[in-house]
């Protein structure tokens, strides 16, 4: 008796035909989805890294020294220069003393003096603690209620590459402008150069000169 072939299942036949026609498209679509997800992930990682790098930008000043005719004779980044031009150091120290010791009735200007003073100080150095102690017991805002103090820097002498002697005179006047006292002081400042790391620091301390230590005494 001859064998009989069972009739084809129409559902199986339809599925096979669908697989043959569209299965490759489904696989290709799945592959492209994987590629798309991978690309998006890499884009997110790249954007995150770029954003992180943007927050790490450091502004480093480039110092150029010129002679009397304006010709450049030395240049470089602060970390490449062992010590700044002594004239620049002396001018910076003179400004520091004036900002530190001046007393004015204008509270806005007084705050600027204090900001400029701390622009040359670092929290870890002894000079900062000494200046803090002075301001704690000698508030310039309280002093300004009854008097003003003007500073005249008389002399700044280099004792070494890192230490300077500063002599100055303080003229105290009452609020009517009458001079009530004149005092002379001498300070010894030990300085160091550290490259500024952001724009805010550069505005207050463009060459990165910091006072590591600072002592001062009244002179007879």
UniProtKB/Swiss-Prot annotation:
Subcellular location, record wording: Cell membrane
Primary localisation category: membrane
Superkingdom to which the source organism belongs: Bacteria
Record's keyword terms, sorted: Cell membrane, Conjugation, Membrane, Plasmid, Transmembrane, Transmembrane helix
InterPro entries linked: NTF2-like_dom_sf, TrbF, VirB8
Family membership noted in the UniProt record: Belongs to the TrbF family.
Bilayer topology annotation: Single-pass membrane protein
Transmembrane helix found in the keyword field: yes
NCBIfam families: PRK13836.1
Name under which the protein is recorded: Conjugal transfer protein TrbF
Residue ranges crossing the lipid bilayer per the database entry: 28-52
Taxonomy of the source species: Bacteria, Pseudomonadati, Pseudomonadota, Alphaproteobacteria, Hyphomicrobiales
Species assigned in the record: Rhizobium radiobacter
GO cellular component: plasma membrane
